[in-house]
Amino acid sequence: IAFMKDWGFDGIDVDWEYPADATQAANMVLLLKEVRSQLDAYAAQYAPGYHFLLTIAAPAGKDNYSKLRLAELGQVLDFINLMAYDYAGSFSPLTGHDANLFKNPSNPNATPFDTDSAVRDYINGGVPANKLVLGMPIYGRSYLNTNGIGQPYNGVGGGGGAGTGSWEAGIWDYKALPKAGATVVYDSVAKGYYSYNSGTRELISFDTPDMINTKVSYLKSLGLGG
């Protein structure tokens, strides 16, 4: 909080990845309540009428968010920034969508997680819809030596640094996508895009401008905060 005061910031965003049990989840709420109290005290003394923001980065994976005290978080926080991305990557056993909106029952391996389930669980858990903010990736996650989405792969490529479009293995800047020779494919059930090159057998999952439009329409329809 002292750092925020010294630099004139508008608030604090807490990124706790992730409370592992009920005790940690309770401690998270206590921490946030204390931060809220100190922000309000600072505002009362130096900026009467001003509301400093308190937000968190929050998981979209059920194993993680099911441990959180959602209703209490919804009360103490201004916004909950949902990390609705990184659903699959180099850490996954199979290729998958990086940030799909929905599950695809006909290809469940491609959608181990989905945004809609997380959003509805947060809301049903007591978080006001207008406090949920949907995170979107501006990069792609790649897989090598694969026959398609939801399939085995071997390697992720990338990581060449400046001028290559990839600063980290398996992750490509949006400006480098789709790569030459790749075909962009839309999964209309999961609501997710990926590119695939049948010659090199490289698959990259990423959000296109059309996908961003779809997500904005989705969050508007549910009254999300942004």
Short names for language-model regions:
Residues 1-6, 62-73, 115-119, 206-221:
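Short, acidic/polar
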Residues 6, 82-85, 180, 186-188:
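Glycine-rich, acidic and aromatic/proline-enriched surface loops and short helix-turn segments
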Residues 10-12, 130, 225:
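Short acidic/polar active-site loop segments enriched in Thr and Asp
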Residues 11-19:
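Mobile, glycine-rich extracellular loop/lid and propeptide segments
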Residues 18-174:
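Substrate-binding surface in catalytic domains of secreted glycosidases
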Residues 177-226:
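Extracellular low-complexity, Gly/Ser/Thr-rich intrinsically disordered linkers
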